[in-house]
Amino acid sequence: MTLRLNELAPAEGAKREHRRLGRGIGSGVGKTGGRGIKGQKSRKSGGVRPGFEGGQTAIYRRLPKFGFTSQIALKTAEVRLSELSKVEGDIVSLETLKAANVVRRDQIRARIVLSGEITRAFTVQGVALTKGAKAAIEAAGGKVEE
């Protein structure tokens, strides 16, 4: 038996029939429409915001603050060794990485990490490196200038 797109249907009992609320006693959900009697949640725009605990100090206020987002980390691009092959020429700097679209234009610093293979020798200028990346570049015949 083949399955055709025009024969797709939800499983039996997976979809419930919509109940019209507030339409008489016989419907089972007349008058208050399943909302109970009085109170904030029975009103038309009733309801509490997410995280509200009925006036009790909420969990996000009971727990201490922690950590922060480093702005330097947001402006530092991580470049893999394998991405260096996109750079034209032998010199790798922040400007050449931006020109090759390896690093976004708004990044103010970059760091080369040991990931992937290096295809040719490069001279790295003014870009941070991890120990492993530095060793891999020097092993391939490249050099690192601070």
From Swiss-Prot:
Residues 1-54 are annotated as: Disordered. Keywords: Ribonucleoprotein, Ribosomal protein, RNA-binding, rRNA-binding. GO terms for cellular component: cytosolic large ribosomal subunit. InterPro entries: Ribosomal_uL15 (IPR030878), Ribosomal_uL15/eL18 (IPR021131), Ribosomal_uL15/eL18_sf (IPR036227), Ribosomal_uL15_bac-type (IPR005749), Ribosomal_uL15_CS (IPR001196). One of its GO terms (molecular function) is rRNA binding. The keyword Ribonucleoprotein applies. One of its GO terms (biological process) is translation. Residues 23-37 have a biased composition (Gly residues). It comes from the Bacteria. HAMAP family: Ribosomal_uL15 (MF_01341). Binds to the 23S rRNA. Part of the 50S ribosomal subunit. Belongs to the universal ribosomal protein uL15 family. This is Large ribosomal subunit protein uL15. It comes from Acinetobacter baumannii (strain AB0057). The lineage of its organism: Bacteria, Pseudomonadati, Pseudomonadota, Gammaproteobacteria, Moraxellales. The gene is rplO.
